[in-house]
Amino acid sequence: KPSKGELYFNGNKEVLDSPRDSQNLGLEMVYQDLALAGNLPIGENIFLGREPTKNLGFLKILDYKKIKEMSEAHLDKLKIHVKSADQKVEELSGGQRQAIAIARATAFNSKLVIMDEPTAALAIKEVGKVLDLINGLKKIGVSVIIISHRMDDIFAVCDRVTALFQGTNFAEAE
């Protein structure tokens, strides 16, 4: 919950009591530390907490085939190239991991993705790929808010920039 003020999204006042409330509205977050499970495959990371299931009698079990198929389709849509959705995240480069975190945030009809320092820990070559991915999100109608100290990256992908200093808005540009 905000410590102060109100939250409006698409013109409606919203009260968010949990991360699930945010997700249900189409608001997602990509954290600076990525919050990926390195020991799990890419597909399972994308669906973590929202895994498709199938019925086995009275039990529900994870549908690994569907996880793989849906993950690969989503990665293709975003033009993210990996060997397989079965590949473990710990085997990926920093840029690929960032791409998987972005794929996870956009896999469920996201309307707005907030990214905290999406290029901070990446090599220059990988930065370009992540910026291309962010531009691709814009093309498919996903709004993106980027929190970053790398102004070159901001100017490369943002349509509007707001600079904050100690919580105060001190500059804006379009």
Where are these regions (language model features)?
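Glycine-rich phosphate-binding loops of nucleotide-dependent enzymes
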Residues: 1-174
